[in-house]
Amino acid sequence: MGKVIGIDLGTTFSCVAVMEGGQPVVIPNAEGARTTPSVVAFTKEGERLVGQVAKRQAIVNPDRTIMSIKRHMGSDYKVKIDDKEYTPQEISAMILQKLKADAEAYLGEKVTQAVITVPAYFNDSQRQATKDAGRIAGLEVLRIINEPTAAALAYGLDKEGNQKIMVYDLGGGTFDVSILEIGEGVFEVLATSGNNHLGGDDFDQRIIDWLADNFKKEHGIDLRNDRMALQRLKDAAERAKIELSSATVTNINLPFITADATGPKHIDVNLTRAKFEELISDLVESTVGPVNQALNDAGLKPSDIDKVLLIGGSTRVPLVQETVKKIMGKEPHKGINPDEAVAIGAAIQAAVLSGEVKDILLLDVTPLSLGIETLGGVFTKIIERNTTIPTRKSQIFTTAADNQTSVEIHVLQGERPMAKDNKTLGRFILSGIPPAPRGVPQIEVTFDIDANGIVHVSAKDLGTGKSQDITITSTTNLSEEEIQRMINEAKQYEEQDRKKKEEIEIRNKADSLIYQAEKTMKDLGDKMTQAEKDEINKEIENVRKALEGSDIEAIKSASEKLSQAFYKVSTRIYQQAGGQTGGATNTDSAGQGTTQDNVYEANYKVEDDDNK
């Protein structure tokens, strides 16, 4: 069995890790960084860019750059580039492909299996979408695990004794809080809560709005209507937020942000940490509710918690740290890297599943209650939130009308009392029920949640034994045909990426060959005949012309001819130098031989002079 990698597929950054020699190791990407921006872009020429290279060109190519796609996982959102629409699963798969390729380059072997993390508060559709993204990227997703749980694994791998810990995970786009009990290799989640639409992106948006509103007041222009200006604001907001984690004031300087009839306009303002905290105070305060909810569900008080772990880049914001300290009455633990802990935990779980690590048991929970719609549009829960998974529960229902021969099972996930206020996971029909007065038929509905948190539902008429089983595939999930099509397209992109890399290598080799040829010609000087120099110069020119075009075979062919021409000259000079016997008859050879002899004589004479 090959290596199983652990992937933290984040909203703004992603990270990949693997177990090596019993220790989890973060895998650096091709650019040498330990995290990769979760950004995908398409150039006007149709080339696909992923990661840092995509993020760098966002300002000049905002319409074709996709960021924070994770916020749309499990929805029917689509990204339109030219005439093609991409689902969140496809864009996420492109990021996963990049992480997979970086892992393969690091490990020196093919990678086909992974554990991928998701926010604890992700619903079934979002989890299924993440699994589909893995498949499209060419990965068998062995397990989907919750990000806070993964972070707890990273923290608790080498810890002894029993501890109750709280993981406060505030990333780029999602917020989770989980309470766990760890000890003797068992990691048991007691409760989880969160908000799938709260994170660092929202902090950035507050700065963007503050800048744009002030600019509009002063100049009457709304920069949010200009895609390129808006992208510059986004970049500046993110930089300012990061700087204010360590500084108390930062300067935002954006020259030539736009122009009107009176000339170019600029932004040059200072943002203090106090003002930034005022802008985001309600967002940070909104994390308090889920923290209290998780504590209540776990039946614990803040004083019962031994350690508080801060995970996700947004927990570097001082106001966030102060808020957590205020709620919990203790300093948060800062002994783990908030950007890497989740990927490290995923790598540990990957090693557990592959048998590389033993004596670790992970007991996670379902974040939201599951049930069905019953008479009057009521949501009837079958599995309560924070139930340990995997789990299976059944409940018996009956018909609502006389002689009803079929029932529609409307499967939902959420906490609200009315069905319409919860998330629909899917619908299916159990038919063939014998006509009978209402209340007589006995229909058993069974919910099964696997270790990935993915739901399977079945309904059975106990009178006839007739049953209907489904794995939830809501309207936002992909069909098998769509997944296969996307897998094939992903392979094409992979092939394009491979060809692009090969093209760059061939071009670099050709450039290097020209440099070496010109340098060697200069070094050899008169040892080369004029005819040889002319031939080499001609071949150099041919390589240069080929490099101006896009025909890779032409570049390879021209490079090969230049190499052969040089090999011919080098061989002649080498043989001539080695086989020289003084009385050569060929004038060119004799001339070359004399030069060669003179060089050696000069060297010896210098040494003799030094000795005198």
From Swiss-Prot:
The keyword ATP-binding applies. Induction: By stress conditions e.g. heat shock. It comes from Thermoanaerobacter sp. (strain X514). NCBIfam families: PRK00290.1, prok_dnaK. Residues 578-612 are annotated as: Disordered. GO terms for molecular function: ATP binding; ATP-dependent protein folding chaperone; unfolded protein binding. This is Chaperone protein DnaK. It holds the Pfam family HSP70. Disulfide bonds: none annotated. The modification Phosphothreonine is found at residue 174. Belongs to the heat shock protein 70 family. The keyword ATP-binding applies. InterPro entries: ATPase_NBD, Chaperone_DnaK, Heat_shock_70_CS, HSP70_C_sf, HSP70_peptide-bd_sf, Hsp_70_fam.
